């Protein structure tokens, strides 16, 4: 497990490889509170599929795997597995609630193209 914090205070911690916004962390905290299970963590992953080749996925998980990178923000944990990590380095994980609806959004500088809905991409 790799621990990541917004400000790396010790040499054992890695620099921040992605941004987990306050809006996203606060929404995750709200959803976890609604579930009533404080052991839940948000897992963000990349898998094959979608109209552009890869797609993002979000799920709640109670387990932290050995190869996960863990980011702590506002009292919640974000998990990214080692395969997905390479596609998400430099990305911003945000939560938007506007006229287009409410959803988690990933702004990924590694994506060369994205589909219209923003849930799939290619590199």
Swiss-Prot record:
Cofactor detail note: Binds 1 iron-sulfur cluster per subunit.
The UniProt record lists the keyword Lipoprotein: no
Binding partners and assembly: Homodimer.
Alphabetized PROSITE patterns for the sequence: HESB
NCBIfam families, alphabetized: iron-sulfur cluster assembly accessory protein, PRK13623.1
Highest taxon of source: Bacteria
UniProtKB keywords: Iron, Iron-sulfur, Metal-binding
GO molecular function: 2 iron, 2 sulfur cluster binding; 4 iron, 4 sulfur cluster binding; iron ion binding
Family per record: Belongs to the HesB/IscA family.
Function in brief: Required for insertion of 4Fe-4S clusters.
PANTHER family (alphabetical): IRON-SULFUR CLUSTER ASSEMBLY 2 HOMOLOG, MITOCHONDRIAL
Annotated GO biological process: iron-sulfur cluster assembly
UniProt keyword Metal-binding present: yes
Lineage: Bacteria, Pseudomonadati, Pseudomonadota, Betaproteobacteria, Burkholderiales
Record protein name field: Putative iron-sulfur cluster insertion protein ErpA
Residues bound to iron-sulfur cluster: 51, 115, 117
Gene behind this protein: erpA
Cofactor(s) in the UniProt record: iron-sulfur cluster
């Amino acid at each position: 497990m790799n621990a990541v914090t917004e400000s790396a205070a010790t040499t054992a911690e890695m620099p921040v490889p992605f941004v987990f916004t306050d809006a996203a962390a606060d929404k995750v905290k709200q959803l976890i509170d609604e579930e009533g299970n404080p052991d839940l963590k948000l897992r963000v992953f990349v898998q094959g599929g979608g109209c552009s080749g890869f797609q993002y996925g979000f799920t709640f998980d109670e387990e932290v795997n050995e190869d996960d990178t863990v980011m702590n923000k506002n009292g919640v944990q974000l998990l990214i597995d080692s395969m997905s990590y390479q596609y998400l380095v430099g990305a911003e994980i945000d939560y938007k609630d506007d006229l287009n609806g409410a959803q988690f959004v990933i702004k990924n500088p590694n994506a060369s193209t994205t589909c219209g809905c923003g849930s799939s991409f290619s590199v």
